[in-house]
Design a protein with these regions (language model features):
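Bacterial N-terminal signal peptides
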Residues: 7-16
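Positively charged n-region of N-terminal signal peptides that target proteins for export
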Residues: 1-4
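Intrinsic, low-complexity N-terminal interaction/targeting segments
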Residues: 56, 61-63, 69-79, 128-139, ...
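N-terminal carbohydrate-binding/catalytic regions of secreted carbohydrate-active enzymes
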Residues: 36, 40-93, 98
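Long, well-ordered core segments of solenoidal/helical folds
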Residues: 42-54, 114-131, 181-201, 253-270
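Eukaryote-skewed repeat-based solenoidal scaffolds used as protein-protein interaction platforms
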Residues: 112, 116-119, 123, 139-196, ...
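Solvent-exposed loop and edge beta-strand segments that line ligand/cofactor-binding
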Residues: 26-35, 77-91, 140-152, 219-232
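Terminal, non-catalytic domain-edge segments
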Residues: 20-42, 161-187, 213-220, 224, ...
Length: 352
């Protein structure tokens, strides 16, 4: 699991409460790094790896490598693989924020062109109902409205920085694009409000992905079942509390989500680690009150009970009941909601 994190960039103007998270490939190596020889290598590779539809693939690890002519030729050939372009795992918006910083140090017009194409790619992922899918694909769970790993939230956060006329992005956006981004942002917030799950007449939180037609919680991979997410909902609530002059609908959504978080703390169990008989580090779910309260990443839609599942998709209530690989290779519990409570108290005071 990738927790919701805020990557703070030196000298970067932040929204109140929210910053734009970047994947490691585009993070500055040190202060005053933009414009350095290494950053120029990264910039060339970012331009080289932009797909023909304007997006970037995820999990690329070699942005800092100086490519040989043969390697550059091979990478150019994959530009046509547009189905790999995504907003998952911080892809595309990381590259765009990097280019914006790099432009300040080295105003190359190619960065402007690439940035605009990247924004258009993001806009192309949005449905009329305001939700964003994570890939430009037409089949499988990739078509769902995706809150998983904060994909949609991170795009909206970037858009919000742009709409606030953050100086970092001013060279890239004209009035026509501002209007597109404003319309997209407004639809995105509306979609968030419409997808908040209502349980027995009471609003709760969100699933990691929602059906693009019905807006109902949806399944992704076999072990990612329709549920209420104690993880992905954190980024959504954080974003909503970052908006100035929140409407009555936004206020209601935040209050309801925070009530759900407060009511569904896990106070009596914790994750611990053992060394098993084969000498491998293994997770266990044990009775304990030490450390932070936890929340389930997946909670049943009707009971709020946390659960887990293996690749067979069968619901279990203890990670010891699923295989080693999924037990240790996925984040089933999180303490991320803890960060919301002090922010929520300040937010409530500001409403008065």
């Amino acid at each position: 699991m990738r927790r919701f994190i805020c990557s703070l960039l030196a000298g970067f103007m932040m929204l109140p409460l929210m910053a734009i998270p970047l994947h490691k490939g585009c993070l500055p190596a040190r202060d005053n790094w933009y414009g350095s020889p290494e950053s120029m290598i990264v910039a060339e590779n970012v331009l080289l790896l932009q797909r023909n539809n304007g997006g970037w693939a995820k999990n690329y690890r070699k942005y800092r490598k100086e490519m040989s002519p043969e390697e550059r030729k091979q990478l150019k050939e994959i530009r046509a693989q547009i189905s790999e372009s995504t907003i998952d795992n911080k892809a595309t918006y990381s590259e765009l924020v990097f280019l914006a910083h790099q432009y300040q140090a080295n105003p190359d017009k190619r960065y402007v062109k690439a940035f605009k194409r990247g924004i258009e790619f993001m806009l192309s992922l949005q449905y009329d109902n305001g939700g964003f899918k994570q890939f430009s694909r037409d089949k499988g769970y990739y078509t769902h409205i995706t809150y998983n790993d904060n994909a949609m939230v991170n795009v909206l956060t970037l858009f919000w920085h742009i709409l606030q006329h953050d100086p970092l992005f001013e060279p890239f956006v004209n009035e026509a694009m501002y209007k597109k981004i404003q319309a997209s942002f407004d639809k995105g917030i509306d979609c968030i409000l419409k997808t908040q799950y209502v349980q027995n007449g009471v609003k709760t939180v969100w699933c990691a992905q929602h059906d693009e037609f019905t807006l109902a919680p949806a399944k992704a991979r076999a072990y990612e079942l329709p549920s209420l997410s104690g993880s992905e909902s954190v980024g959504i609530v954080h974003l909503l509390m970052s908006l100035p002059n929140p409407s009555a609908d936004i206020q209601e959504a935040v209050h309801a989500a925070m009530a759900w978080f407060d009511a569904n703390r896990i106070t009596d169990h914790r994750i611990t680690y053992i060394i098993d008989e084969e000498g491998l580090r293994d997770r266990r779910w044990v009775e304990s009150t030490k450390g932070n309260d936890l929340w389930g990443r997946f909670c049943e839609l009707d009971t709020n009970r946390p659960f887990c599942a293996d690749r067979d998709g069968i619901v279990k209530y203890d990670i010891s009941e699923i295989g080693y690989e999924r037990r240790n290779g996925y984040g089933w519990y999180t303490d991320a909601p803890l960060q919301l409570f002090p922010i929520y108290e300040t937010w409530k005071q500001d409403l008065r």
